[in-house]
């Protein structure tokens, strides 16, 4: 389970603090898939970053004993100057992947980037970056995957592949 206790998050503005959450309390079951829906600017991505502990609340806390992915979003998790392959190796190393060559091969196959896998990520389209980040994440075994819009990009076949991958992970 993921427990959110008295979570408060604000950002400074000229009109004073703009609260995203104020004393939010919630328990997320981890045995089910959970969708967080809301309008643009509602705080979904902020919540994901706090769940992943890549951003911290003003007050309150997030409690869990589960391993969690980073928030997989359209533009996150890659270094533009590095190639897709170099980014994959980097992600594998910081997530303690045991066999980097096997991980790299699985990511390359899943991302469907072909020869572009060895080009700098700065040359990729947003869809290609999303494919790479999604492939890196899905080839690491986390208890919980935080997916933020990444399955809405790419061609219809890749979107189907992404949904099937998430379904398989949820059945494990």
What residue ranges belong to the model's regions?
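Conserved catalytic loops of ABC-family nucleotide-binding domains
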Residues: 165-172
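A short, flexible loop at the N-terminus of ABC-type nucleotide-binding domains that lies
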Residues: 1-4, 8-31, 35, 58
């Amino acid at each position: 389970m993921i427990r959110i206790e008295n979570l408060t998050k604000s950002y400074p503005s000229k009109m004073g603090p703009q609260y995203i959450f104020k004393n939010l309390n919630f328990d997320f079951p981890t045995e089910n898939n959970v969708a967080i829906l809301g309008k643009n600017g509602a705080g979904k991505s902020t919540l994901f970053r706090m769940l992943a502990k890549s951003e911290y609340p003003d007050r309150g806390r997030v409690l869990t004993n589960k391993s969690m992915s980073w928030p997989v979003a359209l533009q996150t998790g890659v270094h533009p100057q590095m190639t897709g392959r170099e980014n994959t190796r980097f992600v594998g190393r910081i997530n303690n992947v045991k066999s980097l060559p096997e991980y790299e091969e699985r990511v390359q196959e899943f991302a469907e980037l072909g020869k572009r896998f060895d080009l700098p990520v700065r040359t990729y389209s947003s869809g290609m970056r999303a494919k790479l980040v999604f492939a890196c994440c899905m080839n690491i075994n986390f208890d919980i995957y935080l997916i933020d819009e990444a399955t809405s990009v790419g061609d219809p076949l890749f979107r189907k592949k992404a949904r099937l991958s998430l379904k398989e992970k949820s059945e494990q």
